[in-house]
């Protein structure tokens, strides 16, 4: 179990909150997280790249010139891979890059990744409570009050983010918003700081406890 200090949106300390998630053994955690990240990135690949082989390129049925007497290298088709516009040798074809990983391992990898970042977590009781309408500057100022630099990549995790908060964060290049029940290993590891709403911590423990 880990205890985190809870901050208000104005940056003041108001209490503590505990988070207790089962993690992988130290001997296997690196490999588990590595496989989870590889799977996530591989599954994002479209795999739609496609080239034409010499049998698929249009034309080339006639021999371009006679076999002998020209002094040139012999050619049987204008669609040979040796000529411009010809087929491609061993070029890419549509394929699936998807990697498998069972649900139990995926959940364990996510919990392990999250708990490995406890030193970078800012637990906030009332994230964006002063926002009545979308305002990017208020989010930037709020993150600054929490001790986060403008140059740092931030992952904001909230239980049920409002449209006002979504629109306010949308224009900030280094800040990403994600719902507590849609976490992924890559985003957790890619951010410099994690800002988690207090209700989101409860949601995380409810959803990812097992």
From Swiss-Prot:
GO terms for biological process: translation. It comes from the Bacteria. GO terms for molecular function: rRNA binding; structural constituent of ribosome. Residues 60-71 have a biased composition (Basic residues). The keyword Ligase does not apply. Part of the 50S ribosomal subunit. One of the primary rRNA binding proteins, this protein initially binds near the 5'-end of the 23S rRNA. It is important during the early stages of 50S assembly. It makes multiple contacts with different domains of the 23S rRNA in the assembled 50S subunit and ribosome. This is Large ribosomal subunit protein uL4. It comes from Prochlorococcus marinus (strain MIT 9515).
């Amino acid at each position: 179990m880990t205890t985190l200090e809870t901050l208000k949106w104005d940056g003041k300390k108001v209490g503590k909150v505990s988070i207790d998630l089962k993690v992988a053994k130290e001997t296997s955690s690196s490999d588990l997280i590595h496989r989870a990240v590889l799977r996530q990135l591989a599954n994002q690949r479209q795999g739609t790249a496609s080239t034409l082989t010499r049998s698929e390129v249009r034309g080339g049925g006639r021999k371009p010139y006679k076999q002998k007497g020209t002094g040139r290298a012999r050619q049987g088709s204008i669609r040979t891979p040796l000529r411009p516009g010809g087929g491609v040798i061993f070029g890419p074809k549509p394929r699936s890059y998807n990697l498998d990983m069972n649900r139990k391992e995926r959940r364990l990898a996510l919990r392990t990744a999250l708990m490995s970042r406890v030193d970078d977590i800012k637990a906030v009781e009332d994230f964006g409570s002063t926002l009545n309408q979308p305002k990017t500057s208020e989010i930037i100022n709020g993150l600054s009050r929490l001790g986060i630099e403008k140059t740092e990549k931030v992952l904001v995790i909230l239980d049920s983010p409002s449209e006002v908060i979504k629109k306010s964060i949308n224009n900030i290049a280094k800040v990403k918003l994600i719902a507590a029940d849609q976490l992924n290993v890559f985003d957790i590891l890619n951010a410099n700081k994690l800002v988690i709403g207090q209700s989101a911590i409860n949601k995380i423990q409810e959803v990812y406890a097992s």
